[in-house]
A protein has these predicted regions:
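Surface-exposed short loop/turn segments
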Residues: 24-43, 107-158, 173-175
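A structural "domain/chain start" motif
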Residues: 23-94, 203-204
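Bacterial N-terminal signal peptides that target proteins for export
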Residues: 1-11
């Protein structure tokens, strides 16, 4: 009886110490990131190149890029894509891109009016597709990579495609901190939009 009691006390002590060790390791907190402040417009049109009401569709993306978890790749060819468990965007990348497009295009006077909602009286529709929205780490150096397809259609229904382009930007983060990667994403996205606006000017 004494041996059994001693064994039970020893077991309880081991369990208690194990639990104490586990509880001493803090669980990482979730962190959320947004796009940075809008930059000063690099281009403002005297007259809108899109002569009418423009609707910005919700950007399309593969399933994994419609979620808020930040994606990353560390292999040399960037074939394998993973997701961070504790780092999230404030909104999914399609909504981040749509919001940034609306804000930047309005500041640039790119269209007579710009809307995100469905409306039968729009004259143009801007459709985008996110191909990459990833944090890429090469030799310990983190970069933000954004790859987007852009198509501008006439009419409310899918009419004629009057503009079509693809843009890819890679911006190195200032450090390996995730907050600096988020800032790099903001700069990369603004570079994509700047290129789109500069090409839009002479295409319509």
């Amino acid at each position: 009886m004494v041996a059994i009691q001693s064994l039970s006390l020893t077991t309880l002590l081991v369990v208690a110490l194990t639990l104490a060790g586990c509880s001493s390791t803090p669980v990482p907190e979730d962190s959320f990131y947004r796009m940075g402040n809008l930059p000063e417009p690099s281009l403002v049109f005297d007259s809108p190149p899109v002569d009418g009401r423009l609707m910005i569709e919700v950007p399309r993306a593969a399933g994994i890029r419609r979620q808020r978890g930040i994606l990353y790749s560390e292999d040399e060819d960037h074939v394998e894509v993973r997701r961070y468990y504790y780092h999230f965007w404030e909104e999914p990348p399609p909504q981040l891109l749509q919001r940034r497009l609306i804000e930047r295009l309005r500041l640039a006077n790119a269209a007579v009016s710009i809307t995100e909602g469905l409306s039968s009286d729009v004259n143009y529709r801007l459709r985008t597709r996110i191909r990459e929205f990833d944090r890429v780490v090469d030799a310990g150096v983190a970069s933000a990579v954004i790859d987007v397809d852009v198509i501008l259609f006439t009419g409310f229904a899918e009419g004629e495609a009057v503009f079509r382009a693809s843009y890819r930007e890679q911006v190195q983060a200032e450090s390996d901190l995730m907050v600096d990667t988020a800032s790099a994403f903001s700069r990369a996205l603004d570079e994509v939009i700047d290129r789109f606006l500069s090409e839009l000017e002479g295409s319509l």
